[in-house]
Amino acid sequence: MLRAASYESLSGSLAKSETSTRSNTRGKGGQSRRKESRGKMRAVSSSSGAFPTEQVLEVWRTSDAVAFDVDSTVCIDEGIDELGMYVGTGEKVARITKEAMEGGLPFGEALQRRLEAMAISRELLESYVKEHPPKFSPGIKELVAKLHAQGKDVHLISGGFRQMIAPVATELGIPSENVHANTIVFNEDGSLKGFDDKEFTSRAGGKADAVKFIKSTKGYKHVVMIGDGATDLEARVSGGADIVIGYGGAQRREKVVAESDWFVTEFDTLVNAL
């Protein structure tokens, strides 16, 4: 795991990269460059004071693609929980979500239990999507725009529902084929039938499978996963995500803080590090 470095470690690394420039510099010019170096270090730190290692920064800057979780990452809320509130079963659905995100419940089981609790119909789902536009996390639009400007592909990998994530992808300029999420299946009369169990994220370890799929089919050398939950950490496997960046701007989960390669609470931190 390429874990976060100390301030002193990264300070030394950045200092080495500028040694040749500073070695012949004196006076105010040298002071200016030292201030610039300190500014670079502050730019890539999270609000918790942790710095990424050189290796993590290198992967972040040279990655071919970045995959984002959606709920409590790209968007500030948990979409399934909000849908549960809409149909009147919000508290029960939220409890199941919390248990799953903290790693205490297999995701496939959690998905089935939440759908059963909501008993959502096609009509209700369509109404919800129309009445609830995406609530984006601060800085995510700027980050995605910069990733696109640098020629990096952006994917959304979510345990949420494709029908609810489609507007998110559209607004961020992410093509539909780069959305990997669950699909609610309805009967002909519009009543709930279940979910498509062929989707990657309908099962445990699905995010890892999704990343391995896009990495192999797209020929990516490096893929970064960004998310707030335990299922995002699972993407860091052989052939999967090279690093996982934990995001705590909406929900802070201690497992993610402890086990991610880099933990941030603001997307501006990632923008500044590109």
Language model feature labels by segment:
Residues M1-G27:
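N-terminal chloroplast transit peptides
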Residues S37, S48-E188:
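Alpha-helical substrate-recognition element adjacent to the catalytic core
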Residues M41-S46:
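N-terminal mitochondrial targeting presequences
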Residues S158-G159, K221-W262:
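Acidic, Mg2+-coordinating phosphoryl-transfer loop and its flanking beta/alpha structural elements
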Residues S176-A210:
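Glycine/Thr-rich beta-alpha phosphate-binding loop at enzyme active sites
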Residues A181-F186, G248-R253, D268-L270:
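Short, acidic/turn-prone active-site loops that include or flank metal/cofactor-
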Residues N187-K193, E254-D261, A273-L274:
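Short, charged, surface-exposed secondary-structure boundary motifs
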Residues S202-L233:
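Conserved Lys-Pro-Asp/Glu-containing loop-to-beta segment of HAD-superfamily phosphomonoesterases
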